[in-house]
Amino acid sequence: MGKKGESKINQEVSDKYSLRGRVFQVIREKILSGEYKHGEELKETALASELGVSRTPVREALRQMELEGLVKIIPNKGASVIGITAEDMEDIYSMRSLLEGLCAGFAAERINEEQLDKLEEIAYLTDFHVKKGNLEKLYELDNQFHEVMYEASGSRMLKHVLSDFHHYVERVRKASLLSPGRSQMFNEEHKAILEAIREKDRGKAERLANAHMKNTIANISEQGLEKNV
């Protein structure tokens, strides 16, 4: 987000809870994208000036991020960035492999026609952009596929947890898509999951979604992509 956009945060929201949430999202994104590095000190006054807000929503956002383990509060100063470590990433993918399977299984039983059509559209567009080599678009479509599946699971808690996990490892996911042959492979895996969901085969959908995560973990390990965390 550019400075001009950040300076208008106050104009985009009308109450302190929305403002705090917006500030939280901006800072969190900068941590997860690597713009704010591990160990970097985040000063309340500097952040407030950068975002065009008072120190109060910045302080509240940093406290919320401390609860997520993304920063460590430094009294009377601000916070130190912790971010997502390589060990965190391993834990996240281990949990995702189980929860994505559960999510796909629920989706096989609960998905509606609109959601199914959306997944099919995403798979079709992904094939198109694989051929074009449009990696930014592939990353966006990968996000969309998983978000629609989370919604189709009908589980509010699964959607919340998996959406956070998906976002936490965005840097390494993007790097994984750049690795040779992975962009084509991940969509073939998506299409297999989609077919199982379409057939309402819960067990098959669970196994394929679980395997999809394990294949991603293997690719990350083979390419040494954990260094991107």
PLM feature spans:
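Short linear motifs at protein or domain termini
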Residues: M1-G105, E109, I217, S221-V229
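Juxtamembrane/interface motifs at transmembrane-helix termini
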Residues: R59-E60, R110-E113, K137-E140, L158-H160, ...
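Alpha-helix N-cap/N′ positions at the starts of helices
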Residues: N76, L99, E121, M185-E188
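Conserved amphipathic alpha-helical segments that form helical-bundle/coiled-coil interaction surfaces
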Residues: I92, E109-K174, E188-A196, K204, ...
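Conserved G/P- and acidic residue-centered "switch" motifs that form tight phosphate/ATP-binding loops
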Residues: D201
